[in-house]
Amino acid sequence: MIGKLMKDWAGNLKRGEVCACFVFAVLFAWAVLLPELGKFGLKQVALFSIGLSIVSASVLVAICDQIKQINRKERVAARRSSKQVRIAFLLCFAALEVSFLAVLLSNWPGFCSTDSNDIVNQVLGVSEWSTWHRYDGLANHHPIFYTFLVWVVFQATAFFGSIDLSIGIFLFLQMTVAALVLSWCISVFVRLGFGKRYILAAFAFMLFNPILANYSVTMWKDVLFSCCALFLIVRLYSLLFHGEKKHIGRTLLVACLLLTFLRSNGFMVVGATLLVLFVIEPDLRKKVAAVGAAVFCAFLVVQGPLLSIMGVQKGHFSESVGIPLQQIAATVHKGGHINEEQEEFINRVLPMEAMRDSYNPQTPNPIKFHESFDDAFLEEHKIEFLVTWASMLPSNLGIYVKAWIDETQGYWNPGYPSWLVTNSTLYEQAPRDYLGFDWDPGFLAQKLIAALPVPFSSGTLIWAVAALVFVGCVGLEKKKRARCLVCVMPLIALLATLFVAAPAVGDYSYIFAFNLALPFVLPIAGLVKAGRPKA
């Protein structure tokens, strides 16, 4: 009797698929409730999580069952002509370009943060050492490739004699690149024959997205990085699901090189994506191996001799181990178990008293940027640091787990408030409005997250993308599930790097790629299909 009820409840889903729904539901429940351990205690949180898991699993099973039934219906391919694709591309580009330009002219010369100021200072040759920057001159702390792009524009516009104009022109070019990439992505799905409703919905998401509008004219490497990630995701989709192999080697190489050099974790994102693609698609292994080898060689050349020849200082090792550094600092702050040998090593990195007083659960920056923090010692003793961190783990497991939760929960706890935008321009000056209607989408985004923190937080965005991919994959056949995984691998790898070295909790710019990818995850996961239903 019970078995029949369970079978009826599961519908078209197999046992493994039902189990997967429960696993996903349990992970979601703990993501919601784990940060509340300090308020309610383990038993109450466990009870709440059981209830939430059952409800979530039931909803997932019902949704997945419906999607699986829909996916059984055959569809007739209906690709559109090249003329229709060009028209769609031009219309999308024109609308996005005008929208972004309105934001730029209303907030001239565009938005800048502390990181942007550091980049401009390097370009102008006035970068000085500080506890925040910790470099004097050119440095790869902010990817030197992005700094180089800014430098090129500054050199080309130097005869104007205006720093603001140079910034404005650079951000105009950045927003144009963003508009081109987004319009190309829309045009791909137009070409593949997706319905007008989906195309219009995806376009509307881009056009009326306040975070995208703000970021397009903000001097952050995350904007171009996220656009490149989206380009790679959509190109992988057109390759793996629709067999579009034309120029795949070149486009894959360009996208991977840009991702590698636009952000410090880009190499890991590219490596993980190429590895999974190599394993899952035997027919593409030669091209993938060639691209991987080229990217690896370029990375070694740039990070080694090229940076040395240019006199560019490498990024500090501490930037790559933010979470382990936080866990050690939390142990010191809370009086955890530390033996004499461990204490001696920690004191060489930063005196324990200073570490105890500087610890901030939400970011390792007060530790890394302390005036007594010895970056040089840490650079020379990387292995010893990792050994010390690992040796402290067994005796301080609870503290380590809590420190990890506090530092990363912005990327997995739905509703955790995120830092979204910056509203100032260079050196914290107020931007100028040349249009007269004071349009700053960043303020709108901030008001939205203040009023509705759940749908506008980093954690919620990530879970939304994960849920769409999950429910879509349940309805796909085995081969297509693997291909879906390849397509979203840049997002998975990006998130994984934040779980190891998040610079701050819940910083939306770090996961901006998820925002851009959200409407395109629907067809990738098979939730929206090309063509029309077969009569």
Question: Which residues does each PLM region occupy?
Answer:
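Specific aromatic-rich, kink-prone transmembrane helix
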Residues: 124, 187, 224-242, 256, ...
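Short acidic/glycine- and proline-prone juxtamembrane loop motifs at membrane-interface regions
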Residues: 114, 214-224, 262
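Membrane-proximal stem/loop segments at transmembrane-domain junctions that anchor or position
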Residues: 311-435
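Start-transfer (signal-anchor) and selected internal transmembrane alpha helices
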Residues: 1-28, 36-101, 529-535
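Membrane-interface anchor segments at the N-terminal boundary of transmembrane helices
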Residues: 165-169, 404-488
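Membrane-proximal lumenal/periplasmic loop motifs of glycosylation machinery
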Residues: 105-113, 124-178, 218
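Membrane-interface alpha helices of multi-pass inner-membrane proteins
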Residues: 249-263, 274-275, 294-299
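Transmembrane-helix motifs of polytopic, lipid-linked glycan transferases
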Residues: 54, 58, 169-193
